[in-house]
Each structure stands twice: as C-alpha cells, then as structure tokens.
C-alpha cells in the first residue's frame, strides 16, 4: 500500500510547494490592499511563456533569471497601470480592474501564441529522474518543497527584520495611518507586487518542469487552488498560505492515489466552501473590523 501511495505523496508535497509560492503572492497583496489580485495566475502563466520564448534563443541557465526579471517587471507594471490610479476608488472598482487585467493578459497571450500550446523547455538537472525507495520521480519533486521553505523563511525574515518589512506590517495594520508615520505607501505596495511576482516566476519554473505544456489559460487552475490555499490558511497570513497549500497539494494527490482522480479538483473547492461556512478567517487568519 505504501509503495502505491509514496509517488502520490511526493507529488503532493511538490505541488503543494508550487501552490505555496503562488499563494504567498495572493496573501501579501490582500494583507496590504485588501484586494484579491485575480491577475496573479495570469502573471504565473506569462512567466511560463517568457521561458518558452527566451529559452528558444538563449541557454536555460541565462533564461531563468531573465524570466524572473521580466515577470517582476510585468507585476510591477500591472500594479502601476491598473491598481495605483484606483488607490482611492471603492474596493469594487479595484476588484473589477483586477478581473479586467486578468482577461487582458489572457487575451494578449492568446494573440501572441495563436491559442496553441507551447512546449516548455527541459531544464537540466531538475528534470532528471531520481529513485526514492519504491518511487521514481523527478529531481524537481524534491527541490520544490526545499526551495519553497527557504524562500518563505527568507521572506518572513525580510518582513520581520528589515525597514521595508516593518513598513509592510504597518500598512497592513493601518493603511490610513501609515502615511502619517512617514511610510511611502506606493513604494510598499510596489514592493509587495514585486515579491509576489518573483515568487510566481519561481513557482512557474518548478510547475512547468512537471507539466510541460503552456497554454494561455493554464494558470487558471493552479491560481485558483493557490487562492483557496491562502483562504484556507487565513488570507493575509504567509505561514497560513504555505501550510494551506501543502495540505491541498497532498490531499488532492492522495485522492488520486485512491482512484478518485476525477474528484481531486472538486475537493479543493469543496474545502473552500467548508472553510467559508465554518471558519471564514481560515486557520491562522485574524478577524478584520472595517473602520467607519
């Protein structure tokens, strides 16, 4: 029985790490702006296409840092063009803008690619096979959770120990009062989007190493699952988002191991409904009171 489950368990831990890198972007933006960045999954997809086109002309080792830089620029541009002008607008307007950006990015990718799936390049070493007990998997399966944990530890350290991290925490606690304390709101928000986009780019490289085909809408499902992970863990809580992502990744793969592959996606969204019904703040989220 263990021999059968082990490959799915390893895959679940790996997928959970990939969801976690996306989920942190959702939860950081929500923590600062109280906004669900619906375009985040499309930025993740764009990172996949960046790699496809850049790796066609440059070595993969050069392409990866370029992909990260381009993805960060895209995330920064989205924030400046679509969200910054609406800083004082009603929250519904910002949410509609986020949905519009998502569809804009999807349609741009459809236009550029003609709607055709693109083959993701093979990345040396992490695409190699490795045997762990009775299971054979890719090196990326082992690298993903380790890299995810290291990146999250680095991020938490930045938030807790640095000046920009203190500013992020201040803005998250009280958006209106923070500017009166000399905090540059625009810089904090831009930094938040930059970090979220960077993590999405890393998650994209890890994700598409296993799922080698990139389409304009491929980021929708991992993006939604990462969002559910953020809600499950307590949106606004980075550790909560990471734990929620690993739980979802492991559970959906164990469901596949039991032979219920069709219901693996349904489990994630059933979990979302249960969380919203019984614990809307998630595992580690705090109840937020609106100021009148």
Give the role of each language-model region.
Residues 51-53, 68-74, 101-109, 147-156, ...:
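Hydrophobic core segments of alpha-helical transmembrane domains in multi-pass membrane transport
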Residues 85-161, 188, 212, 254, ...:
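Transmembrane helix-bundle core of multi-pass membrane transporters
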Residues 19-21, 58-69, 190-200, 206-270:
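Transmembrane alpha-helical segments in multi-pass inner-membrane proteins
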Residues 58-101, 108, 243-248, 279:
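Alpha-helical transmembrane segments within multi-pass membrane transporters and channels
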Residues 10, 32-77, 81, 86, ...:
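Membrane-embedded helix boundary and interhelical linker motif in transport proteins
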Residues 17, 26-49, 88-93, 164-167, ...:
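Short, non-helical or kinked segments that cap or interrupt transmembrane helices
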Residues 15-16, 136-214, 238-243:
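Helix-loop-helix "hairpin" substructures at the membrane interface of multi-pass membrane proteins
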Residues 1-21, 50, 61-62, 89-96, ...:
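Membrane-interfacial amphipathic/re-entrant helices at transmembrane-helix boundaries
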